């Protein structure tokens, strides 16, 4: 029988396939076991999945959870639960983007370490070297280095800069350079002492733009996101929406309505900032964890030099405070905190913003890493930490963990209920107040300006005074003193605005956060 030249004998093909498979196994005996999860990983996945379902049932205010667990350089658990967008009934999946807030610092510090190695912006240079040409009102000594900015020991302060960059979004480069130069103060007594805030990373972003004419967003894309294959990660909200990427919309508890609502503060390009300005997926965070846990190697390649990875994970200053769930006086490296859990070293960085919570951590000694992202922040931060420690305790074999975590869930839900009731009681108390404004509402309408904090626009909304400060919009409620109103510039944080009058009795200013805003229109 003459066989076709284009077809092989099926029996011969089977024999060839068997030989190839046997050779592959001999060359890599672990390959056989990599084809399917082992019994322990399966048990872990079953228990973890069940616990997350219990959490979301007991705390239904949580819209969605995305979680990845890395063990021995492999993702053994990668899932998303719930809704990215409740109003549109859009489900979350492992490619859904979440805003990770301050967890961005780890990425920014890595980019800074790469530039340091290349001699472009040296970490141990004085920051004044890169601020040359700016007239700094504060006398900043040369001992304040770029590294100090990134490990929170600079002794610098500038509340208006960090507020505008993270919240209001009135943060164009020229104006922020001016606010940096004019408003920054230096306190020598604070120099060298850890004081966590966004300022150092914000200043680094400005110096980067000034020195290399490079936006921090583009630096992250070129040096980190692209080389790591993080295709579902961006520092531009506009690009995510243009690509029709699913974004987990932000939610939070509203004491006014007694329900979970969309966060009134949104993230746009203008308030995505170098201390907290990334959106990423849980799949991409799995790659990020693997890179950090494997000394810069990913998928068999050395993507980031090992010496740079070591520099990021080395502690440079004592934090002198607990950072739940990791206790003990820890250290701060370059964009990473270093602490302990169950007497094991943990390297981590959390993030939080109205409507989003993130937890990223790993235990190098046990080769375990976990990331959790939640699009809610009233209780989301605590839930994320609880899920992370559940993972660690399960994989460490902690005794009685199921009973322990059932109790933690119940206690947490009970405390959350008490917090909600306390906030609603405060709303009921404030509802008894009456307006103390002495003029018709229209008389207060106008634009008020402060050179440090920007512009406040006062309008009439719902028979009350409305306020717009950059991206932020809110409606005031009565306060207890003449010509004052209560506002929540940041959700859940009540503050007072007081209007001022000129000698002719005309409204010419308002005061907010201890600063005077002059009426300009």
Language model feature labels by segment:
Residues 9, 21, 98, 413-416:
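Helix-centric, low-specificity signal for extended rod-like, repetitive segments
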Residues 73, 112, 162, 236, ...:
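Active-site-proximal flexible loops/turns
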